[in-house]
Amino acid sequence: MVFALFLSTFASFASANPSAGAARLGDTMLMELKDQHDQTVAINEQTNLVLFAAGKSTSALMSKVLEDLPPTTLKDKKAIYVADISGMPSFITKMVAIPKMQKRPYTIAILRDEAQSKLFPQKDDAITIIKLKSGKVTEITFVTKQEEITKALQ
């Protein structure tokens, strides 16, 4: 998997935050991941929004939201949906999860490595919404309701 990440200004952050090593305000967030079709997805200077789902319930919530929106919403908003499947057994990933994701009309950037997952701020049962401007993190919020995600994508 192609993966490159640049996050700046980590100094003492790790000891002060339960998501040690996770992006924070002012950090530069540039990375390349693979999607459900094994195509490269770039979080770059043009990306405005990253929506991160760290588990099954948050992924289901994201799917529900995106099913109710036009399939081009993520692309139109310069948003990237990132799903963490690092905790999933490889057999389930290969035989069930990826084929199911491949049926979706939108792109899903996939994290398969737990170390990559730790680069994203997380709260239990919440979608992490990271706003970016020119590759820099300008806002991090955690949402649990469909309406909150839909609002972020407007």
Named regions from a protein language model:
Residues F10-T28:
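N-proximal helix/coil linker or "cap" segments that precede and/or mark the start of modular domains
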Residues L30-T47:
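A short beta-strand-turn-helix
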Residues M1-S12:
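Bacterial N-terminal signal peptides
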Residues A42-S59:
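Short active-site neighborhood of thiol/selenol oxidoreductases, capturing the structured segment around
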Residues I43-E45, R112-I149:
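Thiol/disulfide oxidoreductase modules built on the thioredoxin-like
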Residues I80-V82, A97-Q122:
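Short, internal strand/loop/helix patches
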